[in-house]
């Protein structure tokens, strides 16, 4: 018998997987979303993003991770069920280079998803450029940003507020 907590956790995982499948299969023209995370709760981001990344891993295109200083471990990529042969990572990038690299990568159409870590808010022009690049390349872009204290009513443009840390 499962406890009520286990049943809720299973239901949440199943819903996340179904939603990820629908997003990955949808005929999208491109998507940019900001994901707010808190490193104290890594399971939440993994619960939401991993099923989507696993579905996107079935495409012939690459997954690009633009990380500031952290490196993805081979063991984590494999245990997360991501295709090791389709995951690329570039690290040690400054924020402006990261943004420009993300735009170029999204435009190419070679990547199903580009994930980048940024600490600062985007300007309207930067958001417009990212959205146009994602639409051109028919790709998804996730901007990972740590939770910052904010003003009441302040929120990301198109976002998932997830308290987590996928970075190792």
Curated annotation (Swiss-Prot):
Pfam families: SulA. Residues 105-111 are annotated as: FtsZ binding. Residues 161-168 are annotated as: Lon protease binding. One of its GO terms (biological process) is SOS response. Transmembrane segments: none annotated. The record marks 168 as: Essential for degradation by Lon protease. Is rapidly cleaved and degraded by the Lon protease once DNA damage is repaired. Keywords: Cell cycle, Cell division, DNA damage, Septation, SOS response. Induction: By DNA damage, as part of the SOS response. Interacts with FtsZ. Component of the SOS system and an inhibitor of cell division. Accumulation of SulA causes rapid cessation of cell division and the appearance of long, non-septate filaments. In the presence of GTP, binds a polymerization-competent form of FtsZ in a 1:1 ratio, thus inhibiting FtsZ polymerization and therefore preventing it from participating in the assembly of the Z ring. This mechanism prevents the premature segregation of damaged DNA to daughter cells during cell division. PANTHER family: BLR3025 PROTEIN-RELATED, CELL DIVISION INHIBITOR SULA. Belongs to the SulA family. This is Cell division inhibitor SulA. The gene is sulA.
């Amino acid at each position: 018998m499962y406890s009520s907590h286990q049943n809720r956790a299973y239901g949440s995982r199943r819903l996340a997987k179904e939603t990820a499948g629908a997003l990955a299969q949808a005929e999208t023209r491109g998507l940019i979303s900001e994901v707010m995370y808190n490193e104290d709760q890594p399971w939440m981001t993994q619960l939401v993003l991993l099923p989507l990344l696993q579905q996107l891993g079935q495409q012939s295109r690459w997954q690009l991770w633009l990380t500031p200083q952290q490196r993805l471990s081979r063991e984590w990529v494999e245990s997360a069920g991501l295709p090791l042969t389709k995951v690329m990572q570039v690290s040690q990038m400054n924020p402006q280079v990261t943004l420009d690299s993300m735009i170029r990568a999204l435009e190419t159409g070679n990547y199903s998803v580009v994930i980048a870590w940024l600490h600062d808010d985007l300007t309207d022009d930067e958001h417009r450029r990212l959205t146009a690049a994602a639409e051109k390349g028919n790709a998804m872009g996730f901007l990972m940003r740590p939770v910052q204290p904010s003003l009441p009513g302040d929120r990301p443009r198109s976002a998932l507020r997830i308290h987590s840390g996928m970075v190792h």
